Amino acid sequence: MLTIAGVEFESRLFTGTGKFSSSQLMLESIKASKSQLVTVAMKRIDLKTGADDLLSPLRQAGVRLLPNTSGARNAKEAIFAAELAREMLGTQWVKLEIHPDPKYLMPDAVETLAAAKTLCERGFIVMPYVHADPVLCRRLEEVGCAAVMPLASPIGTNQGLVTEPFIKMIIEQAKVPVVIDAGIGTPSHAAHAMELGADAVLVNTAIASSASPIEMAQCFKDAVDCGRRAFEAGLGRVQTQAVHTSPLTGFL
């Protein structure tokens, strides 16, 4: 069982809500994934007009909402978005995202750390999206973040675990849950992240852009489950030298 800020999750697959062709398809895919924590971009929510109504179907599904600050270019904008989410959605939880560069969407480490410190002081449960930087993740943990979310590769690229060496370091030293976010493009990527010891993964594009999002959501669910079970079972040690599986003496 995964625990974040005192809340238990049976599923270690978190999902997003972007890029689906319809709200109904999004809802069915989330149900198929068995995800219990779903991210929602604050910039997509308009309670006055009801445009792109995500909230009603998600609440009907019984999932916990994780509003994110995607679109924020600095700490000030991210803090404003988080406060807005708390007021509109009634939740302290926030996925902190600050990426001022619209081309590569790389997270701004300096602004993220500053925003995280302020939000934690204000009582938010902060889950920051960051580059796979072990030092930064430790600093975020020290200021009170409930989890860290290092990227596997750039958002939406489906490149997989490009940052694997650094993710291993983060997992090794972290005292809070490590959720691998961004760039996970296939179920095998998700399984591998779990085999490394990640506590959870967040997947959006790979499911939403699939030819069959509902089926792909089920595939990711199974992959995450198998990857976690393999990690808990204990993976064999990787070696460069061959090791005999049967004795070479006693039968000749």
Curated annotation (Swiss-Prot):
CDD domains reported for this sequence: ThiG (cd04728)
Key words, A-Z: Cytoplasm, Schiff base, Thiamine biosynthesis, Transferase
Bilayer-spanning residue ranges: none
Pathway involvement of the protein, from the record: Cofactor biosynthesis; thiamine diphosphate biosynthesis
Reactions catalysed: [ThiS sulfur-carrier protein]-C-terminal-Gly-aminoethanethioate + 2-iminoacetate + 1-deoxy-D-xylulose 5-phosphate = [ThiS sulfur-carrier protein]-C-terminal Gly-Gly + 2-[(2R,5Z)-2-carboxy-4-methylthiazol-5(2H)-ylidene]ethyl phosphate + 2 H2O + H(+)
InterPro entries in alphabetical order: Aldolase_TIM, Thiazole_synthase_ThiG, ThiG
EC number in record: 2.8.1.10
Main localization category: cytoplasm
Residue sites binding 1-deoxy-D-xylulose 5-phosphate per the record: 156, 182-183, 204-205
Name of the protein in its database record: Thiazole synthase
Organism from which the protein derives: Shewanella sp. (strain ANA-3)
